[in-house]
Amino acid sequence: MGMMKRQFEDVTRIVIKIGTSSLVLPTGKINLEKIDQLAFVISSLMNKGKEVILVSSGAMGFGLDILKMEKRPTNLAKQQAVSSVGQVAMMSLYSQIFAHYQTNVSQILLTRDVVVFPESLANVTNAFESLISLGIVPIVNENDAVSVDEMDHATKFGDNDRLSAVVAGITKADLLIMLSDIDGLFDKNPTIYEDAQLRSHVAVITQEIIASAGGAGSKFGTGGMLSKIQSAQMVFENKGQMVLMNGANPRDILRVLEGQPLGTWFKQIEEVTHD
């Protein structure tokens, strides 16, 4: 079977997910260059008539920077306080930098219960549609200050990989672009095996792929590759498509949309029916 060519000409609505590791430098300082490039790319896409929703982590990282804390607190209430401070700082910076490119942004903070209850789901769907129709970029994050992860009342999404897949589903996005600190999905862990090969296209998520995504405890673990595979499964359930790519250079998003084979493209093959 020949390689399927990536056709993104018809893609109008795009969800882009960026993680903390892309926004915060190893020193704990904010990666201003990255945020500026991302704002430029999204604004360029908006100017071309695309609709873009940004799912952004980073509240904790921004909060630690502002409060001059060396490491993430272990206490949940403190974590929530740090995230609460960081969320405002992050949105303030996004707002300023997007303004350079004449793009307006808004904030949507979600918890899982919002998308579980039909009434609140309808409301948040309408909010997205309304913002998009006004030419505004919704910036989405989990509402860390109120999210809880307890058995009887779980309102956390788990992480923003899953949140981005949920948002792509809610908004019926044509494409989810997940920016990561790795180049895509490999056939085995590239940090261990030098001969690991990047998978260019994944049409079916097999048990083998889930296994090769690695266990917890590595950057391929929780919030790592496994959650990205689970997100791809959600995208498939919603009949969508996803590209997992390295976020080192946000301008690569423009190259991906031109059909260049960067990262891993998750797209089911349409069933061809014969009479």
Curated annotation (Swiss-Prot):
<dbReference type="GO" id="GO:0055129">
    <property type="term" value="P:L-proline biosynthetic process"/>
</dbReference>
<comment type="similarity">
    <text>Belongs to the glutamate 5-kinase family.</text>
</comment>
<dbReference type="GO" id="GO:0005524">
    <property type="term" value="F:ATP binding"/>
</dbReference>
<feature type="binding site">
    <location>
        <position position="17"/>
    </location>
    <ligand>
        <name>ATP</name>
    </ligand>
</feature>
<feature type="binding site">
    <location>
        <position position="144"/>
    </location>
    <ligand>
        <name>substrate</name>
    </ligand>
</feature>
<dbReference type="InterPro" id="IPR001057">
    <property type="entry name" value="Glu/AcGlu_kinase"/>
</dbReference>
<dbReference type="InterPro" id="IPR011529">
    <property type="entry name" value="Glu_5kinase"/>
</dbReference>
<dbReference type="Pfam" id="PF00696">
    <property type="entry name" value="AA_kinase"/>
</dbReference>
<keyword id="KW-0418">Kinase</keyword>
<dbReference type="InterPro" id="IPR036393">
    <property type="entry name" value="AceGlu_kinase-like_sf"/>
</dbReference>
<dbReference type="GO" id="GO:0004349">
    <property type="term" value="F:glutamate 5-kinase activity"/>
</dbReference>
<dbReference type="InterPro" id="IPR019797">
    <property type="entry name" value="Glutamate_5-kinase_CS"/>
</dbReference>
<dbReference type="InterPro" id="IPR005715">
    <property type="entry name" value="Glu_5kinase/COase_Synthase"/>
</dbReference>
<feature type="binding site">
    <location>
        <begin position="180"/>
        <end position="181"/>
    </location>
    <ligand>
        <name>ATP</name>
    </ligand>
</feature>
<keyword id="KW-0028">Amino-acid biosynthesis</keyword>
<comment type="function">
    <text>Catalyzes the transfer of a phosphate group to glutamate to form L-glutamate 5-phosphate.</text>
</comment>
<protein>
    <recommendedName>
        <fullName>Glutamate 5-kinase</fullName>
        <ecNumber>2.7.2.11</ecNumber>
    </recommendedName>
</protein>
<keyword id="KW-0641">Proline biosynthesis</keyword>
<keyword id="KW-0547">Nucleotide-binding</keyword>
<feature type="binding site">
    <location>
        <begin position="222"/>
        <end position="228"/>
    </location>
    <ligand>
        <name>ATP</name>
    </ligand>
</feature>
<comment type="pathway">
    <text>Amino-acid biosynthesis; L-proline biosynthesis; L-glutamate 5-semialdehyde from L-glutamate: step 1/2.</text>
</comment>
<feature type="binding site">
    <location>
        <position position="57"/>
    </location>
    <ligand>
        <name>substrate</name>
    </ligand>
</feature>
<feature type="binding site">
    <location>
        <position position="160"/>
    </location>
    <ligand>
        <name>substrate</name>
    </ligand>
</feature>
<dbReference type="GO" id="GO:0005829">
    <property type="term" value="C:cytosol"/>
</dbReference>
<dbReference type="InterPro" id="IPR041739">
    <property type="entry name" value="G5K_ProB"/>
</dbReference>
<keyword id="KW-0067">ATP-binding</keyword>
<dbReference type="InterPro" id="IPR001048">
    <property type="entry name" value="Asp/Glu/Uridylate_kinase"/>
</dbReference>
<keyword id="KW-0963">Cytoplasm</keyword>
<keyword id="KW-0808">Transferase</keyword>
